[in-house]
Amino acid sequence: MPVKIPDDLPAAEILESENIFVMSETRAANQDIRPMKVLILNLMPNKIETETQLLRLLGNTPLQVDVDLLRIHDKASKHTSIDHMNNFYRDFEQIRQKNYDGLIITGAPLGKIEFDEVSYWDHIREIIDWSQQHVTSVLFLCWAAHAALYHLFGLNRSLLEIKRAGVFSHKRTSVHYPLLRGFDDEFFAPHSRFAEMDIEKLRAHPELEVLTESDEAGAYMVLSKNNRNLFVMGHPEYQKSTLKDEYNRDIAQGLTPELPKNYFKNDDPDQEPISRWHSHGSLLVSNWLNYYVYQLTPYNLDDMTGITPWESKD
């Protein structure tokens, strides 16, 4: 949250140069406060587990957040009861006319399936397009980040021979973005995917900014320059055992997955995983919610005219 200070206080310029969030008394006096309305499109198979992971991150901020859960309307969930889906999830038609402060679209376990071959690809495209007019800021995670970069910017991913799974070291490529406030010079994040975006193409795109990257795992956080879309190539929401559960699931299915890198103590799957990404995962979501949702969204959600308009690749 911002520190409120008197107008024209000399310290303001110094604090802002150090990336400390300050707000003048005048601005604070004119700022209305209400709950943030966040929509979650949950594409992961275990809906309840993913809900819990994301709500844990959203709840770790001083903001009140009202959450709606969204599902793909014509796709039944194999791992979550129909009662749960009907009781807690909405179809797109139920929210199409609404506006939201934030939207989170999760990853999806689609392996090496091409985007155009995904059975619900047209619906994903429809929701992404809708979000650019009805949502202040969108957070895309893992598969959703790749899908949105492809749909919005025409940037396709490259498939990997071996799944990139593990916990990798990352570094900031800039220190001047509010999203990175509080980030260490080196931090860790989990990845679990069969594809990768070309980091040089991301860097070269005039509408994108690569904020953090990994020598082993490539681009991690990419922001559209209108601040409306944040693409995160990994899984900051993952809990300590998630990569282990995925590894054991693949083995149970008769696959031969590689051991997740930098994850198990002594690279021994019988030992406890090492958790070292939760603080930065929490900080990422907190910074996004504060600086790119709360600080940018209109008080009256019925009027989105003040939000920077989206310009498509066409």
Curated annotation (Swiss-Prot):
Binding sites annotated in the UniProt record for substrate: K163, S192, R249
Please provide, in alphabetical order, the Gene Ontology terms of the cellular component aspect for this entry. Answer: cytoplasm
Query: What are its E.C. numbers?
Result: 2.3.1.46
The record's section on InterPro entries has: Class_I_gatase-like, HST_MetA, MetA_family
For the biological process aspect of GO, one term held by this record is: L-methionine biosynthetic process from homoserine via O-succinyl-L-homoserine and cystathionine
Q: Does the keyword Cytoplasm apply?
A: yes
Q: Does the keyword Lyase apply?
A: no
Q: Where is this site: Important for substrate specificity?
A: S192
Molecular function GO labels: homoserine O-acetyltransferase activity; homoserine O-succinyltransferase activity
Q: What is its main location?
A: cytoplasm
Q: Where is this site: Important for acyl-CoA specificity?
A: G111
Q: Which residues form the active site?
A: C142 (acyl-thioester intermediate), H235 (proton acceptor), E237
Give the record's keywords alphabetically: Acyltransferase, Amino-acid biosynthesis, Cytoplasm, Methionine biosynthesis, Transferase
The pathway noted for it is: Amino-acid biosynthesis; L-methionine biosynthesis via de novo pathway; O-succinyl-L-homoserine from L-homoserine: step 1/1
Provide the protein's localization: Cytoplasm
Which EC class, in a word? Answer: transferase
- Catalytic reaction(s) noted: L-homoserine + succinyl-CoA = O-succinyl-L-homoserine + CoA
Listed NCBIfam families? metA
Q: Which PANTHER family match?
A: HOMOSERINE O-SUCCINYLTRANSFERASE
The similarity annotation says:
Belongs to the MetA family.
Give a short account of what the protein does: Transfers a succinyl group from succinyl-CoA to L-homoserine, forming succinyl-L-homoserine.
**HAMAP family recorded for this chain?**
MetA_acyltransf
Q: In its UniProt entry, what is this protein called?
A: Homoserine O-succinyltransferase
Originating organism: Shewanella pealeana (strain ATCC 700345 / ANG-SQ1)
